């Protein structure tokens, strides 16, 4: 029996990503696909690909073939606004930005304020709408192209419900229950919701690519069962690993456990104190033993954060690994360096977040892609 669990709502234990590929029936992101990405974009690959933070896919090979043939593709991702965003939430958006820039494609970002109202008992609809605005500022701060990006909030972009109806007609309860584990206690809004989440995959008559954490994959499995019957492509996806919280390599960073997370709106000084107090290290019990035996970067959250986001230079990362194993580097040194980088990131992000307040209207309503979507009629196959 596996000692980890991954669902769209819960991640527990130390995840074995190779086993997860088998469980979910996805494919590994191979060296060949990574090299093909570099060849087609003529760009240096970001660390998310080089270090296999994105490790699994569905039909990414077909996405690259579509791009090479001139058919193109589009990107779709999203955010469920149930509270403030933390570093674990934002990292996949940086990978999405790289894909948008280097393939020069449209991006649709769904803000699911309706979903979080349905799935979170303690949240009112006003709460999720308020968090939607706050989360949108963080997303805009990443630096997407405002004319090629449409950020839409489900409670406002009600056309999504019209598009969801024919999709809902294709999904019976047993299909939804098999994927999501719904039961007699599940609210009827929750049972309908997968149709709304699938609707943006039909925004264009091209293949859709979804960059997302692997726990979100079940939503797209259903879409792949019926997309072709509506005259569209099965959606493709590339899956990321999880960013661990400060206190453990198990599970993922969680907003429900504040000591595990660094929030994007945290005061940089307070974030530093949090890292110093809570970040798990792979060091020995004493400095003497650390010097003699070396540390264990494989068991260290601090090293993992450097690997995932905060050390872009591969050679410097490997030197950090070597110095840790050799006992030349102490946990205190590593923590201090990580704190400096996290604080620098937060200061830059928060400055861009403030600037994003003036850009919300363009991303949601007046940018080229936004206007096109507000003006566009419901696609013919989704009117039946």
Curated annotation (Swiss-Prot):
GO CC annotation terms, alphabetical: cytoplasm
Stored Gene3D superfamilies: HUPs, Tyrosyl-Transfer RNA Synthetase
Residue ranges annotated as motif 'KMSKS' region: 252-256
Lineage start: Archaea, Methanobacteriati, Methanobacteriota, Thermococci, Thermococcales
Organism: Thermococcus kodakarensis (strain ATCC BAA-918 / JCM 12380 / KOD1) (Pyrococcus kodakaraensis (strain KOD1))
Protein name, entry field: Tryptophan--tRNA ligase
Classification via InterPro entries: aa-tRNA-synth_I_CS (IPR001412), aa-tRNA-synth_Ic (IPR002305), Rossmann-like_a/b/a_fold (IPR014729), Trp-tRNA-ligase (IPR002306), Tryptophan-tRNA-ligase_arc (IPR020653)
Molecular-function GO terms, alphabetical: ATP binding; tryptophan-tRNA ligase activity
EC number in record: 6.1.1.2
UniProt keyword list: Aminoacyl-tRNA synthetase, ATP-binding, Cytoplasm, Ligase, Nucleotide-binding, Protein biosynthesis
Pfam families in UniProt: tRNA-synt_1b
């Amino acid at each position: 029996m596996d000692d980890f669990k991954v669902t769209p709502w819960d991640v527990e234990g130390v995840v074995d990503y190779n086993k997860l590929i088998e469980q979910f029936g996805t494919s590994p992101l191979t060296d060949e696909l990574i090299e093909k990405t570099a060849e087609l974009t003529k760009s240096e690959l970001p660390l998310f690909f080089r270090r296999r933070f994105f490790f699994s896919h569905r039909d990414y090979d077909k996405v690259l073939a579509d791009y090479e043939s001139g058919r193109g593709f589009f990107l779709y991702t999203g955010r469920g606004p149930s509270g403030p965003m933390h570093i674990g939430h934002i990292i996949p958006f940086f990978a999405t930005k790289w894909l948008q820039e280097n393939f020069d494609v449209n991006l649709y970002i769904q803000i699911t304020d309706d979903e979080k109202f349905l799935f979170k008992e303690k949240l009112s609809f006003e709460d999720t709408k308020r968090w939607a605005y706050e989360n949108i500022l963080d997303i805009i701060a990443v630096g997407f192209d405002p004319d090629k990006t449409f950020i839409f909030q489900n409670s406002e972009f009600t056309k999504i419900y019209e598009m969801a109806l024919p999709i809902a007609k294709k999904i019976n309860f047993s299909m939804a229950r098999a994927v999501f584990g719904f039961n007699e206690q599940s609210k009827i809004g929750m049972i309908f919701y997968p149709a709304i989440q699938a609707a943006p995959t039909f925004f264009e008559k091209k293949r859709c690519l979804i960059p997302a954490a692997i726990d979100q994959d079940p939503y797209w499995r259903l879409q792949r069962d019926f997309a072709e019957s509506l005259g569209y492509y099965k959606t493709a996806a590339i899956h990321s690993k999880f960013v661990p919280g400060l206190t453990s390599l198990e599970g993922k960073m969680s907003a429900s456990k504040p000591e595990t997370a660094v929030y994007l709106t945290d005061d940089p000084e307070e974030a530093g104190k949090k890292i110093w107090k809570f970040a798990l290290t792979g060091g020995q019990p004493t400095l003497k033993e650390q010097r003699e035996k070396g540390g264990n970067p494989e068991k260290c959250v601090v090293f993992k954060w450097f690997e995932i986001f905060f050390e872009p230079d591969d050679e410097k990362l490997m030197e950090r690994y070597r110095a840790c194993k050799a006992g030349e580097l102490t946990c205190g040194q590593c923590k201090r360096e990580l704190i400096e980088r996290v604080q620098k990131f937060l200061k830059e992000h928060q400055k861009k977040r403030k600037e994003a307040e003036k850009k919300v209207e363009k991303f949601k309503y007046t940018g080229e892609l936004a206007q096109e979507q507000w003006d566009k009629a419901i696609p013919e196959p989704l009117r039946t």
